[in-house]
Amino acid sequence: MRKNKVKQMMAEGKPVVNGWLQIPSTVSAEVMAHQGWDSLTVDMQHGLVDYTNALPMLQTISSTDVTPLARVNWNEPGQIMKILDAGCYGIICPMVSNKEEAERFVQACMYPPRGYRSFGPVRGLIYGGADYADHANDEILKLAMVETKESLDKLDEIMSTDGVDGIYIGPADLSLAIGEKPGFDRPEDTKAYSEILRILEHAKKNNIFAGIHNGTPEYAQKMIDKGFNFVTIGADQRAMSAGAKAIVEKMKGSISKKESETY
């Protein structure tokens, strides 16, 4: 089976730089896949992507060396199995609050006897290889999102669940769960920032990977320096918006300067 580059990198102590796809387009997925990301996550929760969009996006990503991942919209076994069968090499699962939910998530990702995933990886066999069934349980990356109030009280039971490779922090939902305003790149004087560091320490103690969503490269680097293995920066639509805005503002400023010089 094709090796999971993301798992290999993190096991070797190398941080993974992950991109985020919210636009349901193979064109934007292709553009992103050629920018040097280690992995790209198709966002099926808050993005505009459904399964019919996700499949061709995964195919597009798979034409490069970038590892294809997906965030599902809920801890629902049928959806998890279906996107894995489509050739996804890792799942980020939202709103995992306790051990029971963690077990439900990881077991949907694994074939018996470790899980209850049904066998039928139509595209997984094409992308992963003929021996997919022999190695998929270990190669598929399984990241549980800890972002609810309950999960903050049950970190160790979630992180010690057999099959959980790591956790992923969504700072916006985490902030809301503890009564603060949502957003990325939490300031150091917020409770959310303290919780992020506490979650990271529990991940280290349980010897699992830790990932987090960031708003800027500078904050992502700060999180890597703290010990995070996996960092996401923004999303495709944010990158497009920021790039376009910078171009327009520079051009408008140049035009205004020229006009003022004529008077």
What are these regions (language model features)?
Residues M1-Y263:
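Expand to "…catalyze enediolate/carbanion chemistry for C-C bond making/breaking, isomerization
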